Amino acid sequence: MAPKQDPKPKFQEGERVLCFHGPLLYEAKCVKVAIKDKQVKYFIHYSGWNKNWDEWVPESRVLKYVDANLQKQRELQKANQEQYAEGKMRGAAPGKKTSGLQQKNVEVKTKKNKQKTPGNGDGGSTSETPQPPRKKRARVDPTVENEETFMNRVEVKVKIPEELKPWLVDDWDLITRQKQLFYLPAKKNVDSILEDYANYKKSRGNTDNKEYAVNEVVAGIKEYFNVMLGTQLLYKFERPQYAEILADHPDAPMSQVYGAPHLLRLFVRIGAMLAYTPLDEKSLALLLNYLHDFLKYLAKNSATLFSASDYEVAPPEYHRKAV
């Protein structure tokens, strides 16, 4: 019996395509094609997005760049904007009473994610495109319905401990109002904080399975931080500083440069991003338990991790860059 042949890819390297990211379709470019275990996968670059968002995707997420699919892209965008207006796809909120940074980020979650792609986001601005109300959702094929159904049922809430909320507000105030900058490289960077947490959990005599899970969660937090920092975790005033860091340390992961305040900002935003993961509700609940445990660790060690003395007044020449 002749061996089964590998499937033939539908798309070629360099081809312009449309690709699902979450519930929406985005213009993208097929950079590489690979066949593994009889499955075709494509390395995708989303047009206009930071290269950190490049990823391998299965063929089921990729569509031809033709008029019919462009129309489908527009219909999905309108349908999801309607859902956002109804509050059905809201991301995480840190608590009922919010002020300063927390309130700002809640607004970003509900408005910004579908108005601006992650590649050109900014921690200090949002933009909206008003759409007329739709009485009836556009008819789409079953694949698209599956994407929408998945998104509708996921609501990820990451709760920030009360002890940490004042640090979020202070961080926001120091940078946006007092025009100070967090001193970089951080005295204790994100990698070091995560390593200390993993060692702390290990010292408590966890089983091998739990130790493995902690290591996976720590690695995941680090990856999310490095991907999201430049696009979603910075205030406008910090961007020139970030550009300088990239120029001075082009090959360094940002988790080796930034510290606790920026790591804490991640948890205000990460709930909205977790809605895009393919995890079922049980797996998400388990992941949230680990994330909340890490936040408790940050709260317990907040006196050593967070300090206003870690910020410095920006010099006059920096202000000119930040305008």
From Swiss-Prot:
Region Disordered, residue ranges: 77-143
Residue numbers spanned by region Interaction with RB1-2: 284-305
Primary site of residence: nucleus
Residue ranges of domain MRG in the record: 152-323
Pfam families: MRG, MSL3_chromo-like
Source domain of life: Eukaryota
Sufficient for interaction with PHF12: annotated span: 149-303
Region (Interaction with RB1-1): 125-191
Signal peptide: none
Region span, Sufficient for interaction with SIN3A: 94-227
Subunit structure: Component of the NuA4 histone acetyltransferase complex which contains the catalytic subunit KAT5/TIP60 and the subunits EP400, TRRAP/PAF400, BRD8/SMAP, EPC1, DMAP1/DNMAP1, RUVBL1/TIP49, RUVBL2, ING3, actin, ACTL6A/BAF53A, MORF4L1/MRG15, MORF4L2/MRGX, MRGBP, YEATS4/GAS41, VPS72/YL1 and MEAF6. The NuA4 complex interacts with MYC and the adenovirus E1A protein. MORF4L1 may also participate in the formation of NuA4 related complexes which lack the KAT5/TIP60 catalytic subunit, but which include the SWI/SNF related protein SRCAP.
Function summary: Component of the NuA4 histone acetyltransferase (HAT) complex which is involved in transcriptional activation of select genes principally by acetylation of nucleosomal histones H4 and H2A. This modification may both alter nucleosome - DNA interactions and promote interaction of the modified histones with other proteins which positively regulate transcription.
Protein name (Swiss-Prot/TrEMBL): Mortality factor 4-like protein 1
The organism of origin for this protein: Rattus norvegicus (Rat)
